[in-house]
Regions:
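N-terminal leader/presequence segments that are low-structure
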Residues: 1-9
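Amphipathic, hydrophobic secondary-structure cores in small proteins
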Residues: 13-74
């Protein structure tokens, strides 16, 4: 069951660009910091935040790889 939820969350994030995911991550952190949520809601938000952070990092890693490849190709010429 947890694996199905994780898979659904990954699919949900797949369509988000870096900026969208980062904005949602910031909003998620703000909601958590504001408090007043139930334990279950807090955990769900925390899990979403972790998934968003990983998605953002993957986007940044991909951008870095593209830049590195472009620089390497330019240096070969």
């Amino acid at each position: 069951m947890a694996e199905e939820a994780n898979s659904a969350a990954r699919e949900d994030l797949a369509g988000l660009g870096y900026e969208q995911a980062r904005e949602e991550l910031v909003a998620t952190v703000q909601r958590l910091e504001a408090g007043g949520l139930s334990l279950e809601d807090s955990l769900a938000l925390w899990e979403r935040g972790e998934a968003l952070a990983a998605h953002c990092q993957a986007k940044l890693d991909g951008a870095r790889a593209r830049l590195d490849a472009a620089v390497a190709a330019r240096e070969e010429d």
